[in-house]
Structure formats: C-alpha cells, structure tokens
C-alpha cells in the first residue's frame, strides 16, 4: 500500500524534519533482539566516561553516548534563503515484516524483510514479489539482470529477472553452488574451524550474512558475515575465490571500491582497509591499515564515489570519517543521533545516516566541513537500511536532488525528496546556538601502526546487526 504525502503543502515539509524531543531513547532487550543485534563478548565501557551535553532540550543532542571531546570545532557555513525544501514523498506499507534491506535500480525498488519475502516496487506501487524460503533477508545488491540476497541462515541466493516479463523473478542458484560444495567436501583441507569443536567448508558462511557489496568492474561480489569472515565471489561462474579471516567478532559491513581497496567494519570495534591483488584466476587481500580501534561496535560503512572519504557509524550513535589524499587520514566526527547508527549512504555531496533513534540525518560535505541540512523524522521504529537514487526530474531542472528510501523495523519504507541546496534553518539555528553538532579538526595523533585510537567507545550492547 502506498500512502500519499503529496497532499501535504510543501510549506509543511519543514515540520516533518525535526526530531520529537519526547521520543523515548530507551532500547529494551526485546527491541535489541528485534533488529537483529547480538551481544558481543567484548567488554563495554562505563557510562562514567561520557560527559552528557548540556543542551537537554535539543532533539539532536539527547544521546546517552555524547561525550566531551578534545577536538576543536569548525565554523558553520553560511546558507542562502529561499532554498528548496526536503520532505516526505510517501510511505510504502505492507504489514508483513520488519524491513532489513533495500536496493534501488532504475525505476525499481527491492525490499527485504523477516517475512522471507522480497517485494519489488515501481513508481511507488507494488510491482512484484518473490519468496526466498531462506531466512530473514539482510542484504540485497543488484548486478545487471542478477539480484543477490544475503540471509540470516548464512546463504546467498541468486535471482534473475525474466527478459520477457520484468515482474517475474526466478532463483538461478545459491552461493556456493551445490557442485562446488560437493567438490570441496571431498578434500579434508577445505574444512576450517568456525567455532569450538565445529568445522565447516571454507567456501560457506557459518553464520548470518550481514552485508553484500559489488565490484562490477572486476565482476566480484563481497559477502560479510557474523562468522567473522569476508568471502570473495566471482559473479561470472559463482566461484568463491577467497575467504578472508577479517575480524575478531562479527563483520557488520563491507564496501568494495574501484581502486582495489575494500573496507570492513566489525563488532570488534575496528575498521580495516584491505588491498586486493589478482593472482591468476584468484584474488589475494592483504591488510593495509586498521583505521580505528574502539569499544563501540562498528555497525555501518559508506565510501564516497570518488573514494575521497570513508564514513563509519557506531553503536554509540556517532559517525566518524577519514579523508583520502595520498593516504587515509582521520577527518572528524559527526554527532547527530541518540542511539546506534544502523546504516549509511553517500550520494553526491550528501551523507545520510539512519539510526535506532528512528531518524535520518542528512549531512552536506563542503571541503572539510559537514553541515547538517535536516533531520528526517516519521518512522516509528529503528531505521535499518537506506537506498539513494538521483532525482532525474530535478536533474533536468539543474537542481541536484535525491530520492531517499528508508526501511524500518516499523514495517514501512518511506520515500523522501532531498535537495543538496536545502538547509533546515530552524535546525541550523539550534545547532549554532548549542555549538554541539560539529566536525572535528585533524589534530588527533595516529598510533604507530597507523590506526586511530578512538575515544568514542560506548556502553551499548548493540554490536551485531
């Protein structure tokens, strides 16, 4: 069902973009289980570390994880008046499951939920659906006519769109293939220890698939898992080329770039950069740099299209970023959420962060300054996933605008229109007065191993998602 928002006057859109100060920031154990985050054995730091900010009335600043920081503030950029507004276009609602994954391509939107159904939407109306029978759909990526889905049960399904009927989807296989599983099972050396007293084939994930990332140029698919590994697949023949023992806890996010670099974020509190080398028909990934080591779980990653900036979100509600010139250098921290950051997307000069606090923060990058353009509110549950597409109609008018899809555990997908030239003036005024929402300077020293020692650890137990 599509709920129209076009009947709302444009002047009222600004009212949608302020967080409700009365929203509860309490996350119950039931909610933790509901959005698929499991506790880690890693120790949590005490809340005494955190110096709560003084602006209690500010919706943006009510985070229980906000803390004092040694970094200096940057100045807010000036904004123009009479700029286009951001706002809700509509909602896609089908009361059958929490939304865990999204993927947008051309005029189609794919949504995955814990109902085991994958639904396809076109022009904001339900267009098609197909059942996967393989557990909660945690990730969806699209490569040409192929759709890859990652599942809670550790499986990766491959689907194809019918060339005669775009609404028909047929499962074309599973990764790894049954043939490869059979061949690998004949050799004892292909079994690795995945848990105490438990072994499994190295080509199979032994726990939930948390994230998928495509490198279309190289024809590769990356899958991250709670089994602490990243696996590399060749799309052409569905072969598993490599299994990377990447982290000491669940891998929550993986992003492949066009420059042979892969980034991974984990519940162990680290973000790692991997260098990909081609060795004949196979790949070899070596660790380049550990970007951060912190107590809070890394829950989301995003990389700008040109690879100039890497963003990661954490269970403490913070978004950190690195800037890349000749090497990766720590750039700053964005504070906009009061609960865990669950998803990130970068589009043009904008950064979008979705959170368990039910909001989406929209940031604009200009050099080393990030301005919070607006806070999109409307979901009644944690925002679990985001997808962003260029607004083609706005592009024709030379107005750089984006269509943002947000999936939530409230069982809905909301559709937003966001302009790069719009700034919520009320939000900006509040930020300036409190001087709390800011980007920090490049003053923090790096450790000898090249990693940044972050003090942004949180007392949250939301480590896997």
Swiss-Prot record:
Gene deletion effect: No visible phenotype under normal growth conditions, but hyperactive pollen germination.
Key words, A-Z: Cytoplasm, Nucleus, Repeat, WD repeat
Whether Amino-acid biosynthesis counts among this entry's keywords is no
Q: Where is the composition biased (Polar residues)?
A: 21-30
Tissue-specific expression: Expressed specifically in pollen. Not detected in roots, stems or leaves.
Annotated region (Disordered), positions in chain: 13-32
- May I have one GO cellular component term? cytoplasm
The answer to whether keyword Phosphoprotein applies is no
Motif Nuclear exporting signal: where in chain: 344-346
| Single GO BP term | pollen germination
Main location group: nucleus
Residue ranges of the WD repeats are 94-131, 132-169, 204-243, 246-284, 293-332, 336-373, 378-426
Q: Localized where?
A: Nucleus; Cytoplasm
Out of the domains of life, which is the source?
A: Eukaryota
Assembly and interaction partners:
Interacts with TCP4.
* Entry-linked PANTHER family: F-BOX AND WD40 DOMAIN PROTEIN (PTHR22844), PROTEIN JINGUBANG (PTHR22844:SF336)
Summarizing the function annotation, the protein's role is: Negative regulator of pollen germination. Prevents pollination in moist environments by inhibiting jasmonic acid synthesis. Stabilizes pollen tube growth.
Indicate what this protein is called per its UniProt record.
Protein JINGUBANG
Source species: Arabidopsis thaliana (Mouse-ear cress)
């Amino acid at each position: 069902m599509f709920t129209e928002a076009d009947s709302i006057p444009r002047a009222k859109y600004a009212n949608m973009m302020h967080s409700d100060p009365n929203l509860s920031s309490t996350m119950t154990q039931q909610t933790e289980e509901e959005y698929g985050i499991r506790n880690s054995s890693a120790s949590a730091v005490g809340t005494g570390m955190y110096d709560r900010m003084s602006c209690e009335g500010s919706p943006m600043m009510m985070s229980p994880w906000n803390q004092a920081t040694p970094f200096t503030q940057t100045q807010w950029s000036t904004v123009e008046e009479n700029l286009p507004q951001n706002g809700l276009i509509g909602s896609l609602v089908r009361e059958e499951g929490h939304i865990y994954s999204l993927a947008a391509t051309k005029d189609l939107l794919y949504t995955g939920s814990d109902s085991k159904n994958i639904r396809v939407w076109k022009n904001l109306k339900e267009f098609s659906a197909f059942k996967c029978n393989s557990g909660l759909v945690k990730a969806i990526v699209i490569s040409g006519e192929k759709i890859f889905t990652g599942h809670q049960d550790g499986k990766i399904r491959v689907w194809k769109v019918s060339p005669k009927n775009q609404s028909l989807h047929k499962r074309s296989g599973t990764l790894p293939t049954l043939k490869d599983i059979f061949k690998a099972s004949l050799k004892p050396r292909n079994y690795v220890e995945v848990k105490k007293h438990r072994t499994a084939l190295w080509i199979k994930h032994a726990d939930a698939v948390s994230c998928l990332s495509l490198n279309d140029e190289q024809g590769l698919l990356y899958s991250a898992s709670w089994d602490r590994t990243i696996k590399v697949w060749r799309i052409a023949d569905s072969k598993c080329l490599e299994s990377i023992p990447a982290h000491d806890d669940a891998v929550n996010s993986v992003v492949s770039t066009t420059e042979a670099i892969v980034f991974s974020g984990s519940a162990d509190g680290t973000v790692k950069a991997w260098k990909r080398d081609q060795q004949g028909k196979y790949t070899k990934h070596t660790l380049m740099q550990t970007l951060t080591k912190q107590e809070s779980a890394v829950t989301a990653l995003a990389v700008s299209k040109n690879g100039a900036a890497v963003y990661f979100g954490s269970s403490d509600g913070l978004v950190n970023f690195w800037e890349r010139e000749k090497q990766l250098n720590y750039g700053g921290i964005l504070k906009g959420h009061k609960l865990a950051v669950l998803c990130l997307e970068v589009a043009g000069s904008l950064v979008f962060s979705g959170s368990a606090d039910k909001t989406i923060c929209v940031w604009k990058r200009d050099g080393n300054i990030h301005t919070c353009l607006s806070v999109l509110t409307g979901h009644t549950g944690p925002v679990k996933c985001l997808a962003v597409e260029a607004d083609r109609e706005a592009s024709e008018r030379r107005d750089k605008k984006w269509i943002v899809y947000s999936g939530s555990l409230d069982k809905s997908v909301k559709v937003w229109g966001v302009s790069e030239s719009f700034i919520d003036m009320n939000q900006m005024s509040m930020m300036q007065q409190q001087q709390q929402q800011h980007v920090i300077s490049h003053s923090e020293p790096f450790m000898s191993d090249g990693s940044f020692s972050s003090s942004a650890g949180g007392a949250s137990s939301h480590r896997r998602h």
